[in-house]
Amino acid sequence: MGIKDWPQGEGPREKLLLDGAEQLSDAELLAVLLRVGLKGLSAVELARMMITEFGGLRSLLTASQAQVCRLDGIGPVKFAQLQAAVEIGKRISKENLKRGKILSDPDLTRDYLMRQLGDRAYEVFAILLLDSQHRVIQFVELFRGTINSASVYPRDVVGLVLEKKAAAVIVCHNHPSGIAEPSTADRRITERLKQALQTIDVSLLDHMVVGDREIVSFAERGWID
């Protein structure tokens, strides 16, 4: 039975309008984007199959076009619809953390970093530059590739901080493996950066490591002070 044949109010679109998007399952939300299913398969059933195939909604939405379009009934148009939804989420997150925003909400920072770095297939080391009142100046990706204590240069970080006249920073990087637990190398990098920033009287507020589903904060673990 297709969604159009469901009793009134039971389809995912109607459910969203009546109860709110937060009440929908992952498959139902995806079905709203897909709009239609396949012959003999409703949009919700197709969505559930897609999520199962990729092992989760996040893995599906960060997969390549070639990977997604290998699924029956999924072509470039549906892939484009999904990517547009993902990009809208990222842009909303950027607006929430736009220049001049006072960084007082840890959850907002986590959400922003997860959206920016959580789906990368390669390592990215980035820095969030703040002024003396902890207002956002800029988010900058500094290094890409295999991040270790030898590939992150404190002088480059210090140079950027001086250029942007930042008074405090949050550094962050992702683990493409999906496991956010910091390594020994991560702790070494943090200590080197902290010492380098102290020479120019700039505070290192945190180092956040982004995994697939979580972010580990050095500050929360007491590793910054």
Curated annotation (Swiss-Prot):
Entry keyword Hydrolase: yes
GO molecular function, one term: metal ion binding
Keyword list, A-Z: Hydrolase, Metal-binding, Metalloprotease, Protease, Zinc
Positions contributing to Zn(2+) binding: H173, H175, D186
Short sequence motif JAMM motif: positions: 173-186
UniProt domain MPN: residue ranges: 102-224
A GO biological process held by the record: proteolysis
Top-level taxon: Bacteria
Pfam families referenced in this protein's UniProt entry, alphabetically: RadC (PF04002), UPF0758_N (PF20582)
UniProt family annotation: Belongs to the UPF0758 family.
Full protein name: UPF0758 protein swp_2203
Organism: Shewanella piezotolerans (strain WP3 / JCM 13877)
Taxonomic lineage from the root: Bacteria, Pseudomonadati, Pseudomonadota, Gammaproteobacteria, Alteromonadales
